[in-house]
């Protein structure tokens, strides 16, 4: 029998260019968690969805604070994808007592390294991408989404700040599940898993970065880890 309090909230944080509705609701996560009897909260990152969308990069300097401010008072189980996973890590570094368990999807060594991928994403959001490159075209399409705000996304990508340092993760001592696709450009997962004191890693089979939120393996592994599987 589970010892997870049935009223412990499950918090979901999406990636760049997404929203709680697009990433979690449309892929069934929120309904599954609710069917398991757990409270569920999808948080829109600053610059996305229903959140404010400032155009000043300085407004995004403490992106994680917007998430911390939206959290319930009690400790939560939290699941993040890509930028949402990084933001949850920053929250857990500052306030580890706010989290009982974390699931980090779509992140790995990219959290600690400056990569060409980051430049390609920024160029795509700015409208300067190679139209024949599927990777860049994905982010160009995000910027052109009529429900989004391309200027806000550009400001977010220009925000001040530095890459995470693995040593910062020493305080993230709660159980953490890292889920990364075998074809995800964010990998490998090893540097992230090794930096976390209490981490488990599961590789998502035949899964790239963009398919992660709709991967049935990802959904099953994540919900089982936070004890929010409906059956």
What are these regions (language model features)?
Residues 3-52:
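Conserved HGGG/HGGXW glycine-rich cap/lid loop of the alpha/beta-hydrolase fold
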Residues 14, 80-82:
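Conserved alpha/beta-hydrolase "nucleophile elbow" surrounding the catalytic nucleophile
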Residues 25, 39-76:
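Active-site loop/oxyanion-hole signature of alpha/beta-hydrolase fold enzymes
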Residues 86-130:
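Flexible "cap/lid" loop of the alpha/beta hydrolase fold
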Residues 140-167:
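Hydrophobic, aromatic-rich cap/lid helix
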Residues 172, 178-180:
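Short beta-strand/loop motif that positions the catalytic acidic residue
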Residues 183-191:
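Conserved alpha/beta-hydrolase "acid-adjacent" motif
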Residues 207-219:
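Catalytic histidine-centered segment of alpha/beta-hydrolase-like enzymes
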């Amino acid at each position: 029998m589970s010892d997870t309090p049935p009223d412990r909230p499950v918090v979901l944080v999406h990636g760049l260019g997404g929203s709680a509705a697009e990433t979690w609701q449309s892929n069934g996560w929120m309904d599954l968690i609710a069917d398991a009897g757990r409270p569920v909260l999808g948080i829109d990152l600053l610059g996305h969805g229903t959140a404010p969308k400032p155009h000043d990069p300085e407004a995004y300097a403490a992106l994680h604070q917007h998430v911390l401010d939206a959290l319930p008072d009690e400790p939560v189980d939290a699941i993040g994808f890509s930028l949402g996973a990084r933001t949850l890590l920053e929250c857990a570094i500052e306030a580890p007592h706010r989290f009982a368990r974390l699931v980090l999807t779509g992140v790995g060594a990219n959290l600690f390294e400056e990569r060409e991928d980051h430049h390609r994403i920024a160029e795509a959001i700015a409208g300067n991408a190679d139209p024949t490159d599927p990777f860049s075209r994905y982010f160009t399409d995000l910027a052109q989404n009529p429900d989004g705000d391309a200027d806000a996304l550009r400001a977010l990508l220009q925000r001040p700040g530095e890459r995470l340092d693995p040593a910062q993760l020493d305080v993230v001592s709660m159980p953490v599940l890292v889920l990364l696709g075998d074809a995800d450009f964010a990998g490998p997962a090893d540097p992230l898993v090794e930096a976390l004191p209490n981490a488990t890693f599961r590789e998502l089979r035949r899964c790239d970065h963009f398919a992660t939120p709709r991967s049935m393996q990802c959904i099953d592994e994540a919900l089982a880890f936070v004890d929010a599987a409906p059956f």
